[in-house]
Each structure stands twice: as structure tokens, then as C-alpha cells.
Swiss-Prot record:
Segments traversing the membrane: none
Self-association and partners: Homodimer.
Family, per entry: Belongs to the archaeal FAD synthase family.
Pathway linked to the protein: Cofactor biosynthesis; FAD biosynthesis; FAD from FMN: step 1/1
Record's keyword terms, sorted: ATP-binding, FAD, Flavoprotein, FMN, Nucleotide-binding, Nucleotidyltransferase, Transferase
InterPro entries given in the database record: Archaeal_FAD_synthase, Cyt_trans-like, FAD_synth_RibL, Rossmann-like_a/b/a_fold
NCBIfam families the UniProt entry points to: cyt_tran_rel
Cofactor: a divalent metal cation
Residues annotated for ATP binding in this entry: 9-10, 14-17, 93, 120
Protein name, entry field: FAD synthase
A GO biological process held by the record: FAD biosynthetic process
Underlying gene: ribL
Length: 142
């Protein structure tokens, strides 16, 4: 059984998220999605609209997802060791250096393949684009 791990904040679920998860699921038999903690999202400059438990519930209900969990706040590698994925997928816009991630995986003895998932071709394919569009619509009305 090939286990795939996908990660993200998953705030304001949109078609870009669905594309990322569908493409991730195609790579294996089981898709485990790690939802970022609120504190982790804030450290990376994102203030989630939905709290971590709401985002976890939303993600767990999505069709491609076999299991959704919250990530560790202090060390991403702890989550990797818990999941032990054969493949780790990254979204097109996730700010992971793949070589650095591979080094960290080697240090903890995890031999996961890293796959970067392509960008979704549709409109509003990122949370920042969705937020921007909402602000434009609000601005037009007031």
C-alpha cells in the first residue's frame, strides 16, 4: 500500500485545494492530509479564517481524503514520522525547498519521495486570490 501525505493550511477550501488533493491521491492508495495548526499558519504569515479544528473537519469530509490529522506545532518531522509516507506531495505554491526537505527526511531515516503538484488552471486557485476577490467585491458594494 502506497501512502501519500499532503500538507497545507486549507483555509477557504477552493478548486486549487481539490486539484492538489485529487492529484495527490492518484499517486497512491491512501491519502493522509496534514492540516496546519493555527499557530503554524500564523508563523508563516497566514491568519486563518477557520480555526484548526474546523479546517480539519472540512478536509476530512473531502472525497480524495482517507485520513486528516493536525500537524505538530513545533516540529513538522514528528508528523512525518507518525505518518511514514511513501510520497510527500507539495502544492505548487508551498514554500518548501525540496532539497532541504529531502535532507531532513534522510536525517530521520525516512525515505519518502517528494512530488510537487502542478498549479490548477482555473480562476481563484489560491486562498490569497479568493481573499483578494472577496475584498474587491466588498469594495464595489461600499
Amino acid at each position: 500500500m502506497v501512502r501519500v501525505m499532503a500538507t497545507g493550511v486549507f483555509d477557504i477550501i477552493h478548486l486549487g485545494h481539490i486539484h492538489y488533493l485529487r492529484e495527490s491521491k492518484k499517486l497512491g492508495d491512501e491519502l493522509v492530509v496534514v492540516v496546519a495548526r493555527d499557530s503554524t499558519a500564523r508563523k508563516n504569515g497566514k491568519v486563518p479564517i477557520f480555526d484548526e479544528n474546523s479546517r480539519l473537519k472540512l478536509v476530512s469530509e473531502l472525497k480524495p481524503v482517507d485520513r486528516a490529522i493536525l500537524g505538530h506545532e513545533d516540529d513538522m518531522m514528528k508528523t512525518v514520522v507518525e505518518v511514514m509516507p511513501d510520497i510527500i506531495t507539495l502544492g505548487y505554491d508551498q514554500k518548501f525547498d525540496e532539497a532541504d526537505l529531502k535532507r531532513k527526511l534522510d536525517q530521520i531515516g525516512v525515505n519518502s519521495r517528494i512530488v510537487r503538484i502542478s498549479k490548477y488552471d482555473g480562476n481563484l486557485n489560491s486562498s490569497s486570490m479568493v481573499r483578494k476577490k472577496i475584498m474587491e467585491l466588498i469594495g464595489e458594494r461600499f
